[in-house]
């Protein structure tokens, strides 16, 4: 059977949660493969609204959910999120949720370092969520990380603590912070271990067995391609690779397992925090998009910056991530605009670009080249078929397809999961 990998094709917050929930009903397994609890998903199921930041979206429907080895895992946040969802009536047990034994832990001093660095950066802030994601990935790459499997071997942790504390104590001294309290840390780990360990499994084995059995696997990406550590607007990016190729390394399945790569894009563009944003609207039009789209971050609550759809960036995202088709979300937010613009290129120092230059100073200085399309007055909210869309909305969708060189597979017209127009089924064999 076909697998599907869902990724954001902009700067995150594209509406992946709803699309993953819509697909998860037919998936046998849902997998998170990168990131941490720094990116949120909002799911609306009936009269219930669920806000997730670490758990795979499939857990809400009881689908087997997996947190892969590519995720940096905060055990205390995990416990809180599980408790919150259980309070909303969601069943979460080791029977329907597994955590990779090799996932690195986010520890309290990672959060400390994240905040200390951001505060010391002044105008150079990159907009971190201060949740310790970056420092935890640094320790993983530096071979200092304490991992989920270490919670079962707390008596054998001294050498690892020597390595990780030597590194962090030196950094903390530079901020006039005291050394890590090793005994307190061991006590914290001992306290949380009993809650975490029942969920710890060799998830690569679970996933390979599922694949051999012909079960549908849905890979759920976090953030978006434009926040990818290699392919995003560096340094205003996250600390992991967010492209679809990461689904393999972050879960323990081979690269052919990704299947249909579904890129999620808003019908306009948003960004949270600092960094270049060529099509940003810092005027009444941008404010109108933000108000109509309720653009506030799920995790941080920060107001999102808004702008017109940037076809250049989405085309770039589709290329580097091998996107098979896109899901266009929040089409209804554009209802009632007399004119709608699409960014089709950039100008910089007299030169025209059909891609975003790599240097941050150039990215900040490019001027967008726009194509203007007539808007529509008829509401698209709640539409579930092409027949319910106004002709100009269909024209807009078709023009987006042409410019990003990628077909639209789904169109979302409201937060409700059923308000979705299916053009091509990603799970079709």
Swiss-Prot record:
Cellular compartments per GO CC: cytoplasm
Biological role: Plays an important role in the de novo pathway of purine nucleotide biosynthesis. Catalyzes the first committed step in the biosynthesis of AMP from IMP.
EC number: 6.3.4.4
Tree of life domain: Bacteria
Record's keyword terms, sorted: Cytoplasm, GTP-binding, Ligase, Magnesium, Metal-binding, Nucleotide-binding, Purine biosynthesis
Residues reported to bind Mg(2+): 13, 40
Residues the record marks as active site: 13 (proton acceptor), 41 (proton donor)
Annotated positions binding IMP: 13-16, 38-41, 129, 143, 223, 238, 302
UniProt binding sites for GTP: 12-18, 40-42, 304, 330-332, 412-414
Assembly and binders: Homodimer.
Binding residue positions for substrate: 298-304
GO MF, one example: magnesium ion binding
Family: Belongs to the adenylosuccinate synthetase family.
Pathway in which this enzyme or protein is active: Purine metabolism; AMP biosynthesis via de novo pathway; AMP from IMP: step 1/2
Pfam families hit by this protein: Adenylsucc_synt
Name of the protein in question: Adenylosuccinate synthetase
Principal EC category: ligase
Cofactor binding: number and manner: Binds 1 Mg(2+) ion per subunit.
